């Protein structure tokens, strides 16, 4: 780590952390060591920013469990939201014409895909092992995008 002008290490002010394979283990849970490290950093005044490909409500659930109150970067960076009130601080939408084209490709190719409209994330999947009743809040299974 670099040092400042006075030779001291600069104080860490922000840690951005991914969920899958970083904060969450293979079982999609947070280890005790990771939870303690995040809580210690929050207690020391460090801003913890979750940055993930996942949708907001899943990232928020993790933030809430750890006491993280900094904005959440989610949806592969296309959305930044406040975990406190859900306010959208940044939202990058795919233009309608391109979204329709992408949906048609996913439907025709029978690809698994997700699309978020408002606060609902739609999961296009044909996998028989997906139980719609067990999907996280804010996610619905669909047969077409």
Give residue ranges: language-model regions.
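Active-site phosphate-binding/coordination module
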Residues: 32-136
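Anionic-ligand binding region
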Residues: 137-145
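Asp-based phosphoryl-transfer active-site loop
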Residues: 11-28, 102
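Extreme N-terminus of proteins, especially the signal/transit-peptide cleavage junction
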Residues: 1-13
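Residues at structural and domain junctions
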Residues: 7, 24-27, 45, 88
């Amino acid at each position: 780590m670099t040092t400042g002008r006075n030779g001291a290490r600069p104080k860490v002010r922000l840690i951005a952390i991914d969920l899958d394979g970083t904060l969450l283990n293979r079982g999609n849970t947070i280890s005790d060591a990771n939870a303690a490290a995040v809580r210690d950093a929050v207690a020391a005044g460090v801003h913890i920013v979750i940055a993930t490909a996942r949708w907001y409500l899943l990232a928020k659930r993790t933030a809430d469990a750890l006491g993280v109150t900094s904005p959440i970067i989610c949806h592969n960076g296309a959305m930044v939201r406040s975990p406190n009130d859900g306010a959208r601080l940044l939202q990058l939408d795919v233009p309608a014409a391109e979204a329709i084209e992408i949906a048609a490709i996913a439907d025709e190719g029978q690809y698994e895909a997700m699309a978020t409209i408002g606060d609902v994330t739609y999961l296009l999947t044909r996998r028989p092992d997906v139980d719609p009743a067990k999907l996280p809040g804010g996610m619905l299974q669909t047969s077409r995008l």
